[in-house]
Each structure stands twice: as structure tokens, then as C-alpha cells.
């Protein structure tokens, strides 16, 4: 017996008049890609989504078709026209699916919510086993005020605890949503969203709730673009969960990984964990004659590896130096060394990596620090260099998009490494990340199709990564 499909429906029919951009807001650029591309990517990569339908307004059809083709979004099997209202777009999707079984699960999402967490899709799909309609919502945090718009006076202030803010996706059994729209299209009923239409047309139906995330914002006003860009700059731990896939790591077997700074610390652990998945690894560091601050040194090392393997699939730069001193107390030589290792070295690695990764459509991974968001006293050069690494990553991600090369940056919380111990001494147990956790997280980023992101690794991640590592090291 064939299982019923899970179909993602992305509503991309808006024109974005409130945004004031002069073009539909789903084409706003954030972190190197349009909002629509980010959203399609989430559904494309979700293992439970079988196919995707995009609902477009007519003038954007060719542009969406081009985006889908260039990105290779294989799950998108239809781009259909929507209508003036949101309900017209949903109705168009229902009509396109009229030959599908009634129990087909539909996950309907706004194209302009590009920060959707993968687990929300999973929870919606699971909840449809109990309900025929599901909404995603978060508790209201501000006081809700019921206003008379004619007099501009407060009518009442309801109890906030009973009110939630709706988001998307909204999920439905196809048969239920079709039945609701059959009644709705007869007229006389107003609905602001698909769940409200189900509630008004089918009062016997219970609508389940999945708890959303505050970061799942909708791009509506110009300030939302700024907020979304900042959220993409610092992806929270749930984003790491989104891209973590043990299967993809096993798919990296026999791929070639080069780690600059691989002789100790996080770099050494990346090599150790990578070997567990059958990845061919090469460590470059001063101990084997490679100076990250010397581009000729890196060029020679990469050429040697390529001569042996005939390819390089992934490159990681973990090389770093941290002087815990005021700027005034640092010697000129220490300043130059810090810049060369922490920033110039990253540039050298990126420049040298390009032709090799272009050949394999590979991945590059750099490392930043929480200090990139705000300069820290006693390590001004280090923190400013790490801010530069973030900006470099985001810029290069856009330059490399046409060549299908991925570049990301991992931002680990305080990690138990020799460099940190040397700078700060012995710190309390349980306050520092295990470098193996950071190593595993780094490999999952390499295995993903993400690009242009700064991905946090936090202590909470050890809760689930430690179980994976325990099985790996049995």
C-alpha cells in the first residue's frame, strides 16, 4: 500500500506593497539568497516532504521557474498561478491536487517566512495523525487590546494567556481543506487564513496547535529585512539541528577533507571524527611546514594533496591565535602575527581553495567567535579579526553561488581547547563545550547544502550530539 504524500505548498503570490521595495518581497535578498530560495530550500531538504508546489503571481512565474532550475530544487514539481487574495492561492493549490487522495497531508507556508525550523514541519506532519487541521502559533507577549476603530477607543483588554500569535505553516488533510473551501466559495464567510476558514465552515473540526519559534518572522515591513538578516548572521542552535544528518556524513566516505590547523584543538578533533565516517583527511599546520599567513605555503600544500588525490572536496580553516592582552601591551610583532593568522590566513585559504572547490562543488568552513558581535577588551585584534571573518564568509558566499561552492562559518561557544586554556587558565567543568561536539557540528555543516551562514554551536547541542558521538566511538 502506497503511503500518502506530504506536500509542501509555498505561497509566493504576494506583491509586497507594504514593504515598499518596488518588487515582491519574496525576492528580497537575505544572506546571499532571496527569501523564496531560503524557504524552498527548507522544504527541499526535509526528509518527510515528498513534493513541493509553489503558488506564484503571474508576473513572477518565470523568475521563480529560473530560481528553481538554477538551484536544482528537485522536489518542486509544479509552479501554479495564485490569485488576488491568500484564499485564492490556497484554492488554486487544492484544485491542482484534486486527483490526490483525501488523506494527503498539505503543509502550507508563506514564502516570506524564510527562517522556519525543520522540526516545525515534522511536528505539523505528525500532528495530522490526530487532527485534520493544524496551526503553528506562539504565545502573545504583549498586551492584546480590542479597539473601536471608529472612535479610537479601547473596548476591552482580554486575558493575554488565552491568546496566541498565528504563524505558518498551517497543515491540513487535503479532504478537510477541500471540504472547507467548497463551503467557503459559496460566499457569506470571511476568513483571514486557512485555519480560520476551516473553523468557520467546519465547526465540528478541532484545530491542533504546534508551538512555533519567535524567529519564524514574516517579512512585512522594511525593518523585518534587517531583523531577518541579523537572525541569519547568528543562526541559533535549532538551525544546527535542522541540518544535522548522520546519513549525510556517511555519504562523505572517500571524500577529501583538508583541515588547516589540524594538529591540535578543534581541528584535530574534526580529523578524528571525520575518519570515523571514512573521510580522507589531511592536516596542515606549522608542525608540517604550512604557515597560514603565507599564501605560497598553502598553495604548495593544496597542490601536493591534489596531486595525490586528484580532488579536494572540503576545506576547513581552524587556525587561530589569541593574545589575552590590552592592545597597548602587545608588541608590533604580536599584532602582525594575530592579524596574519586570524584574518589574512582566512583570506589566503579562501583564495587558494577556490579552483579546487569549484571543480568538486565543495565546501569551505571557517571559524569565528562570539566576540565577533562586539569587540572584547584584552583581545581587540582577535575579536575584530573574527568580525572580519564573518563578513568575508557572507560576501564570498554570494561570489561563489554561481559555482555552487558552499562557505559557512561556525561560531562555537567557549570550547575546551589548548588555545583557550593558555589564554584563560583552568575553567569550571561543565562550562565549556567538548571540542568533539564542535567537530561533529562542523562536519554536519560541511555535509549540508547551507551557504553564507554563521552557525552557533552551544552547550545545549551536547544534549543530542553526545549520544551520536557515544555510538560513533563504541
UniProtKB/Swiss-Prot annotation:
Where are the stretches annotated Ribitol-5-phosphate cytidylyltransferase?
Answer: 1-238
User: A Gene Ontology MF term for this entry?
Assistant: 2-C-methyl-D-erythritol 4-phosphate cytidylyltransferase activity
Q: Name one GO biological process term.
A: isopentenyl diphosphate biosynthetic process, methylerythritol 4-phosphate pathway
Which SUPFAM superfamilies does this UniProt record tie to the protein?
NAD(P)-binding Rossmann-fold domains, Nucleotide-diphospho-sugar transferases
| Stored Pfam families | adh_short_C2, IspD
Q: Which UniProt keywords apply?
A: Capsule biogenesis/degradation, NADP, Nucleotidyltransferase, Oxidoreductase, Transferase
What reactions does this protein catalyze?
D-ribitol 5-phosphate + CTP + H(+) = CDP-L-ribitol + diphosphate; D-ribitol 5-phosphate + NADP(+) = D-ribulose 5-phosphate + NADPH + H(+)
Would you indicate the residue range of the signal peptide? none
Q: How does activity depend on pH?
A: Optimum pH is 7-8.4 for D-ribulose 5-phosphate reductase activity.
> EC number(s) per UniProt?
2.7.7.40, 1.1.1.405
Q: Where is this region: Ribulose-5-phosphate reductase?
A: 250-474
Q: Part of which pathway?
A: Capsule biogenesis; capsule polysaccharide biosynthesis
| NCBIfam families listed in its UniProt record | PRK00155.1-3
Q: What does this protein do?
A: Catalyzes the NADPH-dependent reduction of D-ribulose 5-phosphate to D-ribitol 5-phosphate and the further reaction of D-ribitol 5-phosphate with CTP to form CDP-ribitol.
Tell me which HAMAP family the record gives. Answer: IspD (MF_00108)
Protein family (similarity comment) = In the N-terminal section; belongs to the IspD/TarI cytidylyltransferase family.
Name of the protein described by the UniProt record? Bifunctional ribulose 5-phosphate reductase/CDP-ribitol pyrophosphorylase Acs1
- The scientific name of the source species is Haemophilus influenzae
